[in-house]
């Protein structure tokens, strides 16, 4: 189910030389990450069809804001209590290119460990400074505990 997302209000930064420099550094790092994703995506091994992937939007603690995530669910998962792994992609809380990039890893974890894997797209700096990304992960944990 795709819900419209409302961008949360960005934190006002002073347009200092330091902040502008930080924006250029982040833009460069994000560009390099997208290039890496594009080049290595073709080289990754193909995944089997034993894991179902669903895109969801779950509510944030901020009214009217939703967080995007992918749920990886093994098709032959046994009944009973089900373990959950929340994947926090390695972007240093600043590069959007890594969300969804660990798809092969998530497939392997879900398939081999017979658990749900939640791949969460949290907010990134510098547009959304700390602790906002951490709060998004906390919201993901709360959502998992409620469901």
Could you describe each region identified by the protein language model?
Residues 33-80:
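N-terminal cap/lid segment of alpha/beta-hydrolase-fold proteins
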Residues 84, 114-118:
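A fold-wide structural signal in alpha/beta-hydrolase
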Residues 97-105, 118-147:
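Catalytic nucleophile-loop/oxyanion-hole region of alpha/beta-hydrolase
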